[in-house]
Amino acid sequence: MVNNMTDLTAHDAAPAWQTRDHLDDPVIGELRNRFGPDAFTVQPTRTGVPVVWVKREQLLEVGDFLKKLPKPYVMLFDLHGMDERLRTHRDGLPAADFSVFYHLISIDRNRDIMLKVALSENDLHLPTFTKLFPNANWYERETWEMFGMTFDGHPNLRRIMMPPTWEGHPLRKDYPARATEFDPFELTKAKQDLEMEALTFKPEEWGMKRSTDNEDFMFLNLGPNHPSAHGAFRIILQLDGEEIVDCVPDIGYHHRGAEKMGERQSWHSYIPYTDRIEYLGGCVNEMPYVLAVEKLAGITVPDRVNVIRVMLSELFRINSHLLYISTFIQDVGAMTPVFFAFTDRQKIYDLVEAITGFRMHPAWFRIGGVAHDLPRGWDRLLREFLEWMPKRLDSYEKAALRNTILKGRSVGVAAYTAKEALEWGTTGAGLRATGIGFDVRKWRPYSGYENFDFEVPTGGGVSDCYTRVMLKVEELRQSLRILQQCLDNMPEGPFKADHPLTTPPPKERTLQHIETLITHFLQVSWGPVMPANESFQMIEATKGINSYYLTSDGSTMSYRTRVRTPSFAHLQQIPSAIRGSLVSDLIVYLGSIDFVMSDVDR
């Protein structure tokens, strides 16, 4: 079991919103010793991690060096781009029209590093990172699609979110952000035929053979409207009988341009959009966004806000896990637990609705706090739920999860090791099932999680379908422990920080100071202006690690909103985990991943 929290210095005593260059991070010294003191430009940010600009020619060498350090950076957590052309606050940074960033994580150090490469509009070429990290494949495809950077040596650089016939790169600043800026859409017969032809799967384009000397392979579409695909999701299977020789996941059917929307919504009005990223997570989705904005603004929230946010997050975690466990059991062949789960989930929705006024998508967290204080009687509703739920969990295990048929269908199926999980960017229960207890709430506490007593369930070395689902059951029990502590130790105090960037001033103050009233007017009419900087926040979401990487250029809107979701990485892993298995095993594997397509496609 790897549950290493040594060198836990990702969170220092200084406020999280301080701008730092992290020159004291050991990795900066290691890089300078190897490549020279002037090889890099270190960018001060509020991301909480070292941000290092490297030369394009050195990118692979630096990446390989970091991957082979004594305490290596073993996971490519995220990779994407930015259009720098309209950015005005770039003092001290290398000249760039576009940039690409690489976010790496070291488990042994519990530290991150972000590498950046500056690119000219006339030369958007850089080497592929897939030779070092296989999960760079999808990230580079999306970065090319959205910005136009070409990753030389990429095995299959093609569109991933948009239709194959799409023209342009949507996240460029000169690309329209509203539908009204396009010509009216018209689907002619010729265009329909073209689109249908473009969606035809051609095995040769993916390095697949249609046949061998002895047999022909069958190619089967699973989805995009298959009940076991859990959303608009298509997998093309290369089959030899019922055995899966290879497969190609096809995503993007649920893509809505969430990151583009972040560039034209105010910092405050983007909060409802976060709920729709992973539509089962509710307030869990809001947490990383508001924390990242609070870092930009320099806001420290009251203790009561922290505990309220934790309470709502754990309620939604339980809600999501219940749906996951019951639908997994249904995928294997048992129906009853689904009806059990919806009874239990209704109790959570009643509690959430009483507190926030909404059920699935509350949009209730605010920059600097929450929308309003807890209502009278919230504690009674929570206490009743905590008395009800533990016994129900026991019934799930007894009725279904200990069933020999279910275990026969899931034990040892779609198994992978810790090394494979890290290579593919797997987080959440999928990673912890391999024995690595990486839970952001414990390793990098946020919103006061360091004050709660709970355990991080881990597996015994190999992550298979059964281990993943049983870990979720234990995570439910730990969430109940956290909720009990919220009930017993809810602090008194305000439900919002008294900060000019988020909270209107008291009436008596506006009657005394005209500047206060002017500021209030501007904040309400245009929205708050966040200082020019970059911030980053990761959290332990319901399905793995979710993060927001925000860039402010000193405006009322985000210059760049990068949303990293766990499900995107998890679906990319499917071919490596399922090759050689049966189609029936694939159905069980899909059920064990715990994903929704909005979390994949954004």
UniProtKB/Swiss-Prot annotation:
Q: Where is this region: NADH dehydrogenase I subunit D?
A: 216-602
For this protein, the record's Pfam families field holds: Complex1_30kDa (PF00329), Complex1_49kDa (PF00346)
List the membrane topology term(s).
Peripheral membrane protein
Q: Which Gene3D superfamilies match?
A: Cytochrome-c3 Hydrogenase, chain B, NADH:ubiquinone oxidoreductase, 30kDa subunit
**GO MF terms, alphabetically ordered:** NAD binding; NADH dehydrogenase (ubiquinone) activity; NADH:ubiquinone reductase (non-electrogenic) activity; quinone binding
Q: Where in the cell is it found?
A: Cell inner membrane
> Which residue ranges does the record annotate as region NADH dehydrogenase I subunit C?
1-192
Per its UniProt entry, which superkingdom is the organism in? Bacteria
PROSITE patterns per the UniProt record, alphabetical: COMPLEX1_30K, COMPLEX1_49K
**Catalytic activity line of the entry:** a quinone + NADH + 5 H(+)(in) = a quinol + NAD(+) + 4 H(+)(out)
A GO CC annotation given for this chain: plasma membrane
Q: Which HAMAP family match?
A: NDH1_NuoC, NDH1_NuoCD_1, NDH1_NuoD
**What family does the database annotate?**
In the N-terminal section; belongs to the complex I 30 kDa subunit family. In the C-terminal section; belongs to the complex I 49 kDa subunit family.
Tell me, how does this one assemble?
A: NDH-1 is composed of 13 different subunits. Subunits NuoB, CD, E, F, and G constitute the peripheral sector of the complex.
Q: Which PANTHER family match?
A: NADH-QUINONE OXIDOREDUCTASE SUBUNIT C_D, NADH-UBIQUINONE OXIDOREDUCTASE 49 KDA SUBUNIT
Q: Tell me the function of this protein.
A: NDH-1 shuttles electrons from NADH, via FMN and iron-sulfur (Fe-S) centers, to quinones in the respiratory chain. The immediate electron acceptor for the enzyme in this species is believed to be ubiquinone. Couples the redox reaction to proton translocation (for every two electrons transferred, four hydrogen ions are translocated across the cytoplasmic membrane), and thus conserves the redox energy in a proton gradient.
Q: What is this protein called?
A: NADH-quinone oxidoreductase subunit C/D
